[in-house]
Design a protein with these regions (language model features):
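Single conserved hydrophobic/aromatic residue that forms the stacking wall/gate
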Residues: 1-6, 10-11
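Alpha-helical "hinge/linker" immediately C-terminal to small N-terminal DNA-binding modules
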Residues: 11-39, 45
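Central regulatory/effector-binding core of bacterial HTH transcription factors
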Residues: 45-107, 177
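A late-sequence structural motif
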Residues: 60, 211-245
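Hydrophobic hinge/microswitch elements
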Residues: 83-96, 102, 156-213
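Flexible hinge/capping segments at coil-to-helix
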Residues: 110-148
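Short beta-strand->loop
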Residues: 112-122, 207-220
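Secondary-structure junction motif
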Residues: 131-133, 138, 146-167, 234-238, ...
Length: 245
């Protein structure tokens, strides 16, 4: 009888140990989850995925990222650097939380668009083309000049091409480049007339290295925009950064 009772107690003790181990593991998991949730809510940890072009990163997003990192050093920020069409695809595919892009943008019921700041597209030239400085030009005169511009897969190129087509002009570029910084460098070397966003050219113009071409009808200004996906919520960290923008 003692042996039987002892066996029952042993079984009960073993079952209790097994139950306790599961309960303890569950409690630890819950405790860890609560701790991680608290860290997320208090901006001590987390990550943000952003899409941005060279233009929007340099002339809009970067100062905000610097300020955000000073406020919340524990938050990791991943930036996918790509032109506007690719950034839109990344957003709608769920690869980024939000994007900073340039208009015009395609109509999409899933995409929420918020205008951030105004931008202007201009043409610039170097000393080789000094005879154009101070003149008011017609866009048809671009047909006779070597043109340097961005590649086709950018919103900037699409916008400028569309505007010029309404003016009866189709650009036949000598050089098509992937970044606006390179356009400025090519123009500096007198390789042609550059189609560029004004912000990229301003420092060169201020120093007198390059000058802006003047036209009878300026290209209408457009906007940098913040885009997000209406179908998906964003993390606490992503929402906090959006509040700063």
């Amino acid at each position: 009888q003692r042996s039987l009772v002892g066996s029952e107690m042993c079984i009960r003790d073993s079952a209790g140990e097994i139950l306790y181990s599961h309960v303890a593991a569950g409690y630890e998991s819950i405790s860890l989850g609560e701790q991680q949730l608290s860290q997320l809510l208090h901006m001590e940890t987390g990550e943000i995925r952003i899409g941005a072009s060279d233009m929007t990163l340099q002339f809009y997003l970067l100062p905000y990222l610097e300020h955000f990192h000073q406020l919340y050093p524990g938050i990791k920020v991943h930036v996918t650097n790509a032109p506007t069409p690719s950034t839109i695809n990344h957003l709608l595919s769920g690869n980024i939380d939000f994007g900073i892009v340039t208009s015009p943008l395609p109509a999409d019921p899933h995409m929420e668009i918020k205008q951030a700041r105004e931008i202007e597209d201009i043409f610039i030239a170097g000393p080789r083309f000094s005879y154009l400085q101070g003149k008011t030009l017609d866009y048809h005169e671009l047909d006779e000049l070597p043109i340097i511009c961005l590649e086709h897969d950018t919103s900037t190129r699409a916008y400028v091409d569309t505007f010029l087509s309404h003016e009866g002009v189709t650009l036949q570029p000598e050089f098509e480049l992937s970044t606006s910084d390179m356009i400025a460098q090519f123009v500096m070397r007198n390789l042609g007339i550059g189609s560029i966003m004004a912000d990229f050219a301003q420092s060169y113009i201020d120093r007198g290295d390059l000058f802006r071409l003047q036209f009878k009808k300026p290209i209408p200004k457009r906007h940098m925009c913040i885009i997000s996906d209406r179908r998906r919520g964003m993390s606490v960290a992503a929402n906090k950064l959006m509040e700063l923008l």
